[in-house]
Regions:
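Juxtamembrane/disordered regions of integral membrane proteins
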Residues: 2-196
């Protein structure tokens, strides 16, 4: 048995999944916009990164990592809090998990995020240990798929910024849709445990 139960008795699963997926997409779009602003402000060019002669790029990199995790975490929390009132630390956990995870490499982006998010909801979901596993697979997969779409669209769209935006939407869609399905499963399982 778990310490807390998901909140609402009336639960529209398809709507909740759509909200979760949309929130994840919006979070990625906001993070993308903030990251583009950071790139502009710090004149973050590939040449400057490879030469390593600008210490402020470290600050820019940290800000970029924090902003992406923060924007996705906040957008998801706005949906999650409706059903999981104990999720108050979701935003800082997602921010930290994403930043630390991706700092170690793209493959760890989902693991870091998933572990941090699981820590927040571990007492709510009896089968919540699936969350980091799914996140470890889906976050990098979504990111790579979005990056591939973005790369394929740069020439046809004639804009790296627009192609990147489409890629980010694909990233958010994949991550949001699959983690949303897992979240629904966890919520259903928890309701079944609570009803027993």
């Amino acid at each position: 048995m778990t310490e807390t139960q998901p909140a609402s008795a009336s639960f529209n699963q398809p709507r909740y999944w759509l909200w979760w997926t949309a929130a994840t997409i919006v979070g990625w779009i906001i993070g993308y916009a903030i990251n583009n602003l950071i790139i502009t402000v710090f004149n973050f060019t590939e040449e400057a990164v490879t030469q390593g002669d600008r210490p402020e790029l470290i600050i820019a990199s940290i800000l970029a990592l924090i902003s992406m995790g923060l924007s996705v975490g906040l957008a998801q929390w706005l949906v999650l809090r409706r059903e999981v009132p104990t999720s108050t630390l979701w935003v800082p956990a997602t921010t930290l998990g994403f930043a630390v995870g991706i700092w170690f490499g793209l493959a760890f982006m989902g693991l870091g995020t998933g572990l941090a998010q699981w820590w927040v909801v571990r007492k709510t979901f009896s089968k919540g240990s699936w969350w980091p596993t799914i996140s470890a697979i889906i976050w990098p997969l979504g990111y790579v798929a979005g990056g591939s779409v973005s790369g394929a669209l740069i020439v046809p769209l004639g804009s790296q910024l627009l192609a990147g935006l489409v890629g980010i939407v694909v990233t958010g869609l994949i991550i949001g849709a699959i983690t949303g399905a897992v979240l629904l499963w966890l919520l259903r399982e928890q309701r079944a445990v609570g009803a027993a």
